[in-house]
Amino acid sequence: MYDEALAVDRIRAARAAVDAGGEPFVLVGRTDVLLVGGGLDECVRRANAYLAAGADCAFVPGAADAATIGTPVRELDGPLNVVMGLTGNTRTLDDLRELGVRRVTVGGSIARAMYHHLLRAAREMAERGTFSYADDQLSPTELNHLFRRA
């Protein structure tokens, strides 16, 4: 984890670059304090420093229960971003809205879920010689409809 002053300087520089570019962009101030065993006080202090330096929202990986989400929501000077889609997440979007979360990140969880399905299909073909994995797929019509909308 970066020294706090260095992290603030980096966010300040990123904000200047974003503003100079003129394109819509969300600058996220991420603090990994909870992931490295730090407490909520340090987490909130760092996140508020990042917001003051120009971050549009504060991203706090590791905030998952009502306390670790609710405290930053109440004490931050800007919106909170949390990560969901990890193993064991039981909160819903409605739960997160009620707690005051303004942005949700899913990271690579959707891709990892797809890789899991791919690996299951490959193992089924290699080990059993069957193709039942294909029973759970989008039809060509559904795919074409999705691509037309995109």
Language-model features, listed with the residues they occupy:
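Alpha/beta enzyme core
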Residues: 1-82, 86-106, 113-115
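Extended, intrinsically disordered, low-complexity segments
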Residues: 16, 108-150
